[in-house]
């Protein structure tokens, strides 16, 4: 089993934080339109992006959103996030009709004002009006974010063979193991998994070597 993250920059394979969409950024397809609830479940947003032309989309945000998140600022510093002074310039970069993109943005801003998204039922506790530039955009597509499958371990981080026996001296933790999370996982749980079983594997492997 794998978990897909919806917004990974291609070809750098840089994961673009959900903080961008959570802060009010929107997803735009190659027709210059929104196509999904940007902050819905990862698998749903990923599937929606893959259904778009060429299987990718653009994240569109403004200066206010960039200023709210140091990760986003980092994307700009390394050249992944592109900056534009107007929507017309953004449309040129995306190769979409500027009038269509402006209409998409006008609709979005009206949804923010009304706190209601009749198209995709987005939550509006953190939505932002995007009428003011400058604007920033980055192209993204879904990418593998976490693997839930792997070797079986016990509570001592010892790897178990296919016959159910402990393999002496072999320890494992994290994404190379399976059975810890089932078919999906929550980020905080995965961190706990890596920390707890990682420390256990390190301690027990050191003890084993010292025998």
Located regions from the model:
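Residues forming the flavin
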Residues: 1-211
């Amino acid at each position: 089993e794998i978990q897909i993250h919806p917004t990974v920059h291609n070809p750098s394979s840089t994961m673009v934080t959900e903080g961008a969409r959570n802060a009010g950024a929107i997803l735009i397809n190659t027709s210059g339109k929104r196509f999904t609830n940007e902050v819905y479940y990862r698998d749903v947003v990923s599937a929606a992006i893959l259904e778009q032309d060429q299987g990718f989309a653009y994240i569109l945000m403004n200066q206010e959103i960039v200023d709210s998140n140091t990760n986003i600022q980092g994307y700009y510093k390394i050249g992944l996030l592109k900056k534009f002074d107007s929507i017309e310039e953004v449309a040129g970069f995306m190769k979409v009709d500027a009038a269509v993109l402006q209409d998409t943005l006008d609709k979005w801003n009206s949804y923010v004002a009304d706190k209601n998204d009749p198209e995709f039922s987005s939550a509006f506790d953190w939505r932002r009006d995007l009428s003011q530039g400058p604007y920033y955009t980055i192209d993204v597509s879904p990418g593998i974010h976490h693997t839930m499958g792997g070797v079986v371990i016990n509570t001592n981080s010892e790897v178990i063979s296919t016959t159910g026996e402990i393999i002496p001296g072999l320890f494992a933790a994290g994404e190379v193991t399976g059975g810890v999370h089932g078919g999906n996982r929550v980020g905080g749980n995965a961190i706990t998994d890596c920390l707890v079983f990682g420390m256990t594997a390190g301690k027990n492997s050191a003890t084993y070597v010292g025998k």
